[in-house]
């Protein structure tokens, strides 16, 4: 199997502190049974979030099908019960935002859940605020935790607006997104020039271009990284399912290829969390299992990547 490519003062103080710690000593385990998943800090604030989030691309785009909406709500309930927090969506994702709102209303989630991440995706800066408000109403939340400029669309207008929302206390974090290896040079320039809290990009066992420049730069700049497309929309797992999981995967508690793939991603020092999407309760529980137990060190990560490349 071939990989796609070979290869403010508060923030500075926080990063300096991290530099004094062992590579993974900033990872935390929450103390209650429902939240024993491993977490990592958001560099700009130190707030801890679980290593595994929940994406909604395709899987939550179920229209007005109430049975499917309820099934997605069950996935969300299982996600929260297993210690998950971040749910990510976008106006681009069809009815996914409304599905999330239905699920949150049905479950009756309390304060602090979810960590709501959405995006602005419209080719007009003037229309951005209206789109954001429409998205907020679909979720049924008082505000978002994180808003991202989706695929850098009209970022020159949207990014200043999001930063103004944050300064006014109407938003906690600001980010940008890209996917499938596109526009990495532009993302790099924005990481260097803009006060970003998050960057979202594609990173998985095969798509590893971000390792070369973006992941090291995000770590240097104190920007949290969300990894999207961890399974290549399922194609990676379908291919891996043709092969047996190597016995040494048990060293880090993997009980399947999904956990193998996710542990590889979130064990990268620069990656804050991954956001696999699923419409299966069993799968969301398996995915959250990747945030439990031991994580691969650098040597084991190399072994994991080499093994998959050899298949």
Where on the chain are the PLM-derived regions?
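Short, well-ordered coil/turn segments that N-cap beta-strands
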Residues: 49-52, 84-85, 110-114, 141-145, ...
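Generic structural signal for well-ordered alpha-helices
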Residues: 39, 76, 97, 101, ...
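A structural motif corresponding to the C-terminal end of an alpha-helix
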Residues: 82, 165, 267-271
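Active-site-proximal loop/turn and secondary-structure-junction residues that shape catalytic pockets
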Residues: 58, 91-93, 120-122, 153, ...
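Conserved, mostly hydrophobic/aromatic
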Residues: 42, 54, 87, 100, ...
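N-terminal binding-site loop/beta-alpha segment at the start of enzyme catalytic domains
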Residues: 2-113
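Glycine/proline-rich, positively charged
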Residues: 122-209, 213, 220-226
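Structured C-terminal cap/extension of enzyme domains
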Residues: 42, 198, 213-311
């Amino acid at each position: 199997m071939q990989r796609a490519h070979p290869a403010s003062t508060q923030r500075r103080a926080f990063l300096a502190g991290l530099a004094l710690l062992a590579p993974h000593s900033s990872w935390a385990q929450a103390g209650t049974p429902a939240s024993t998943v491993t977490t990592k800090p958001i560099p700009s604030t130190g707030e801890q979030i679980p290593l595994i989030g929940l994406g909604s691309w395709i899987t939550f785009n179920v229209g007005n099908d109430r049975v499917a909406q309820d099934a997605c709500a069950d996935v969300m309930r299982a996600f929260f019960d297993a210690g998950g927090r971040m749910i990510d969506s976008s106006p681009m994702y069809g009815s996914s935002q409304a599905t999330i709102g239905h699920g949150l209303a049905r479950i009756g989630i309390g304060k602090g859940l979810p960590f709501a991440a959405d995006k602005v995706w419209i080719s007009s800066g003037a229309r951005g605020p209206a789109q954001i408000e429409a998205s907020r109403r679909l979720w049924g939340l008082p505000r978002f935790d994180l808003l991202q400029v989706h695929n850098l669309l009209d970022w020159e207008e949207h990014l200043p607006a999001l930063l103004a929302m944050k300064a006014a206390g109407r938003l906690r974090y600001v980010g940008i997104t890209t996917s499938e290896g596109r526009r990495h040079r532009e993302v790099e320039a924005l990481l260097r020039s803009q006060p970003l809290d998050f960057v979202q990009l594609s990173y998985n066992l095969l798509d590893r271009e971000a390792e070369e420049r973006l992941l090291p730069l995000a770590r240097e700049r104190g920007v949290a990284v969300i990894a999207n497309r961890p399974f290549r929309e399922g194609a990676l797992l379908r291919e891996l399912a043709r092969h047996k999981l190597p016995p040494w995967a048990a060293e880090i508690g993997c009980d399947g290829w999904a956990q193998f793939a996710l542990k590889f991603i979130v064990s990268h020092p620069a990656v804050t969390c991954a956001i696999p999407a699923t419409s299966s309760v069993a799968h969301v529980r398996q995915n959250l299992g990747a945030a439990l137990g031991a994580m691969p060190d650098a040597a084991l990560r190399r072994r994991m990547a080499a093994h998959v490349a050899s298949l």
